[in-house]
């Protein structure tokens, strides 16, 4: 982006003298040139000034056509005195201009070539710092992502831990129930064994009682000694009958014993099967519980490691943020310092520009008056005091036009145009 700015400066009005020429005056031209280059804030301003001063020794001669009037002599003497004083001022201004040029040249040599300060190393430092800030921001984002991943992993482990804990509690509850079942089964088995023992004792008691009754009956029969003859059919053999009854009782007892043995054997087998099954289930449950405890310990260890890693990452994040905060404060301080230097440089350039404009206005005034004196000295034959007095009341305006070409906020070229307007 480039654009051109044009500024116009008008100096204050001043009075100029009319043209007077004396025939006996010889004029010797003296020329001087000045070139000033100054820069502020990375912009340059080139000002070239050329001026010509005509001076000479004014001899004492009478003014043609004026009749030796005393007032005209006094006027010429006054003009000569003013010319000498202005020539002295011009010399002083040239000396001051050379001194200012040397100062400006020294200042430009200190600031760099062509009045443009080299900000390249600052830009390079800023770019490096920006790259570091970007890299640190990426590292910070990666650390935050790792923290989020660790937090999610910790949440997953917490959910797994709660699930495994619920499973463990359920298995422990099942084991407790199975233990109650085993205890109930053992109690039932003991009760059945007690009943079997009682039935065995009852069977032995019945056998003994039966034998005693049989022996009693046999004794009664043997001791009676009675012979009864009855015209009746042949009586049955009592011993045989008793043997049959004994055999029936023994068969019945054997049958009852076998049924009881079979029943209680079946009950014992069923109880043993149940106990074996429950024992296998208990062993499986104990194995599962052991595995769950190991898994729980592993998860607790992983959870502790994740917590420690999370704490370390948070500490690293805090340190990184603190370090970058300090770096940002340092960079802000550097930027403020550079901005203050830039503002001082611009202010110094503006001050020097104002001083130069003031000197240029004075120089233009002096050149105009010197030109007037030169015309007075050259055109002495046509000089008229009334014309000189009339022309002394005329006004002149110095118009100074400055044109600057700005590209991307920087002044790349500047031209000055000075014009003297008479009124």
From Swiss-Prot:
Residues 72-384 form the IF rod domain. SUPFAM superfamilies: Intermediate filament protein, coiled coil region. The keyword Acetylation applies. Glycans are attached at residues 31-32, 50. Residues 72-107 are annotated as: Coil 1A. Keywords: Acetylation, Coiled coil, Cytoplasm, Glycoprotein, Intermediate filament, Isopeptide bond, Keratin, Methylation, Nucleus, Phosphoprotein, Ubl conjugation. GO terms for cellular component: cell periphery; centriolar satellite; cytoplasm; cytoskeleton; external side of plasma membrane; extracellular space; intermediate filament; keratin filament. PROSITE patterns: IF_ROD_1, IF_ROD_2. Phosphorylation increases by IL-6. Residues 242-380 are annotated as: Coil 2. Expressed on the plasma membrane of hepatocytes and in the narrow apical portions of supporting cells in the vomeronasal sensory epithelium. Detected in the type III alveolar cells of the lung, in the proliferative crypt epithelium of the small intestine and in the older intragemmal cells of the tongue. The modification Phosphoserine is found at residues 7, 11, 16, 19, 31-32, 35, 43, 50, 52, 57, 60, 85, 137, 170, 384, 391-392, 394. Residues 381-423 are annotated as: Tail. Residues 69-121 are annotated as: Interaction with TRADD. The modification Phosphotyrosine is found at residue 37. The modification Phosphothreonine is found at residues 295, 397. Residues 126-217 are annotated as: Coil 1B. The modification N6-acetyllysine is found at residue 124. When phosphorylated, plays a role in filament reorganization. Involved in the delivery of mutated CFTR to the plasma membrane. Together with KRT8, is involved in interleukin-6 (IL-6)-mediated barrier protection. Involved in the uptake of thrombin-antithrombin complexes by hepatic cells. Heterotetramer of two type I and two type II keratins. KRT18 associates with KRT8. Interacts with PNN and mutated CFTR. Interacts with YWHAE, YWHAH and YWHAZ only when phosphorylated. Interacts with DNAJB6, TCHP and TRADD. Interacts with the thrombin-antithrombin complex. Interacts with FAM83H. Interacts with EPPK1. Interacts with PKP1 and PKP2. This is Keratin, type I cytoskeletal 18. It comes from Rattus norvegicus.
